[in-house]
Curated annotation (Swiss-Prot):
Localization per record: Plastid, Chloroplast
Family: Belongs to the carotenoid oxygenase family.
Protein name per the record: Carotenoid cleavage dioxygenase 8, chloroplastic
InterPro entries cross-referenced by the UniProt entry: Carotenoid_Oase
UniProt tissue specificity: Expressed in flowers, siliques, inflorescence stems, petiole and leaves, and at a much higher level in roots.
Physiological role: Involved in strigolactones biosynthesis by cleaving the C(27) 9-cis-10'-apo-beta-carotenal produced by CCD7. Produces the C(19) carlactone and a C(8) hydroxyaldehyde. Also shows lower activity with all-trans-10'-apo-beta-carotenal producing a C(9) dialdehyde and the C(18) 13-apo-beta-carotenone.
Organism: Arabidopsis thaliana
GO cellular component, one term: chloroplast stroma
Gene (UniProt): CCD8
Length: 570
């Protein structure tokens, strides 16, 4: 069945900003007639200068705030605001709502992601390099109070203090490492790398609410676990793990959190494998439930950005896209950055019992590349109540590693409108628990129905680890160089509904279930959208019909963000 494309005329661009506080991004910026940057001003910076070029400002709530003017740059194509840095460290204010917000929607949506891609005279290479920027949408009685703030990680504070890069980011290495000619410096850098000293704590990937109410920003380095105040967005400090596992450098960027516990994976670069760990709500101590040894024989474990759980099992991916110590130590990145592609070594999926830590299945599967698992559940084919097969769904990029290099900022900024986005699908793993050597990887829904793009997914959290029906994710309306649509995928009926507006780049669609709902898709979907004209807005879609029910425009453009969480009002 063909996708349903919901394309609506753009609503009015007028809005009201109230109780606004603004702080400029750099402490050495001046005000008045002086420039806030000595670099040539691109159009979005000109807007920032007009609106945000003051240390403190209060804007009359009765007067509409001007939007970015349509920018005209002679001789060059304007860069989409999704790939531009925020122009101030923090902002807060009320947004004017167009449409009607459900009365039951009371709480806070937080979104994390890279929001600053330059420091001093250095421009970062990759989407994943940017310094963490939190965005808040507080829903209260049909009103939306919004804010954003840069996370005060050690990496960001050091960069701001010294006006240069000081820690290794995803594709970036400090100049001090690159230019050091001392023959013994390489040994020192290995020590700093494996001790975690030189790795970033720039927690720019996800944000989670722990079972005890604490809110934590995360990235793939363990030191990049940072607590924040979800009301003020202020940084509280490092999450101090009370265990001996912190000597390992990296972790999954996407732990799985419930009201009672948190599960995560810790890759082992020395003895390639994965530790499966669990932490109870209210505790800072992680317990090792079990360990999986990599089957490939490679020098590094497969990249594990995310994983999945069922009611009784943990699903551990072992991709042929593997961590490479050689590439980790490089001063200049390769097209695969800190990884290498080893399809000749095989691809695997492991299944571990949550209760015993026993590996109950370890199967070889076709090669795959995935950032994000969607969900997993157990199937009982014999009808005796005992699981015989694990179904695990993910956003799978057709074993095409080009997606990593397509996220270079110069590519994103220069290829807008060109159909260069690599294909992706919902990949469905079937993992037998009968001792079989092989599992299956299938396409769950025809990829053309969601534009052959599929990532940044969410589900109804009440169906975590259970059989489910609906996936909310970023799809595409081609031609495009990045997912530019929101998709609701019915994996049972194999149907897709898409939301798309020309020139828009939406971030992860986050599903919030209606309290007391009896249908899986009874709720709302929240996304923050970056506009081609330099603006941005929050959009709410009905979880069932996937029709727009409300939007609220920011008074400035927000860059693209990654992952979010929902914090219900007490």
């Amino acid at each position: 069945m063909a996708s349903l494309i919901t394309t609506k005329a753009m609503m009015s661009h007028h809005h009201v900003l109230s109780s606004t506080r603004i702080t400029t991004l750099y402490s050495d910026n001046s005000i008045g007639d002086q420039q806030i940057k000595t670099k040539p001003q691109v159009p979005h910076r000109l807007f920032a200068r007009r609106i945000f070029g003051v240390t403190r400002a209060v804007i009359n709530s009765a007067a509409p705030s001007p939007l970015p003017e349509k920018e005209k740059v002679e001789g060059e194509r304007r860069c989409h605001v999704a790939w531009t840095s925020v122009q101030q460290e923090n902002w807060e204010g009320e947004l004017t709502v167009q449409g009607k917000i459900p009365t039951w929607l009371n709480g806070t949506y937080l979104r994390n992601g890279p929001g600053l891609w330059n420091i001093g005279d250095h421009d970062f290479r990759h989407l994943f390099d940017g310094y963490s920027t939190l965005v808040k949408l507080q829903f209260d009685g049909g009103r939306i109070f919004a804010a954003h703030r840069l996370l005060e990680s050690d990496a960001y504070k050091a960069a701001k203090k010294h006006n240069r890069l000081c820690y290794r980011e995803f594709s970036e290495t400090p100049k001090s490492v690159i230019i050091n000619k001392n023959p013994f410096s390489g040994i020192g850098e290995i020590v700093r790398l494996f001790s975690g000293e030189s790795l970033t704590d720039n927690a720019n990937t996800g944000v989670i609410k722990l079972g005890d109410g604490r809110v934590m920003c995360l990235t793939e380095t363990q030191k990049g676990s940072i607590l924040v105040d979800h009301e003020t967005l202020e940084t509280i400090g490092k999450f101090e793990y009370d265990d001996v596992l912190s000597d390992h450098m990296i972790q999954s960027a996407h732990p799985i959190v419930t009201e009672t516990e948190m599960w995560t994976l810790i890759p082992d670069l020395v003895k390639p494998g994965y530790r499966v760990v669990r932490m109870e709500a209210g505790s800072n101590k992680r317990e090792v439930v079990g360990r999986v040894r990599c089957r490939s024989g490679s020098w590094g474990p497969g990249w594990v950005h995310s994983f999945a759980v069922t009611e009784n099992y943990v699903v551990i991916p072992e991709m042929p896209l593997r961590y490479s110590v050689k590439n980790l130590l490089r001063a200049e990145p390769t097209p695969l950055y800190k990884f290498e592609w080893c399809p000749q070594d095989g691809a695997f999926i492991h299944v571990m019992s949550k209760l015993t830590g026993e590996v109950v299945a370890s199967v070889e599967v076709p090669a795959y590349v995935t950032f994000h698992f969607i969900n997993a559940y157990e199937e009982d084919k014999n009808g005796d109540g005992k699981a015989t097969v694990i179904i695990a769904d993910c956003c799978e990029h057709n074993a095409d590693t080009r997606i990593l290099d397509m996220l270079r900022l110069d590519t994103l900024r220069s290829s807008h409108g060109h159909d260069v986005l690599p294909d992706a699908r919902i990949g469905r793993f079937r993992i037998p628990l009968d001792g079989s050597k092989y599992g299956k990887l299938e396409t769950a829904v025809e990829a053309e129905k969601h534009g052959r793009a599929m990532d940044m997914c969410s589900i109804n959290p009440l169906y975590l680890g259970q059989k489910y029906r609906y996936v909310y994710a970023c799809g595409a309306q081609r031609p495009c160089n990045f997912p530019n649509a929101l998709s609701k995928v019915d994996i049972v009926e194999k149907k897709v509904k898409n939301w798309h507006e020309h020139g828009m780049i939406p971030s992860e669609p986050f599903f919030v279930p209606r309290p007391g709902a009896t249908h899986e898709d009874d709720g709302v979907v929240i996304s923050i959208v970056s506009e081609e004209n330099g603006g941005s807005f929050a959009i709410l879609l009905d979880g069932s019909s996937f029709e727009e029910i409300a939007r609220a425009k920011f008074p400035y453009g927000l860059p693209y963000g990654l992952h979010g969480c929902w914090i219900p009002k007490d």
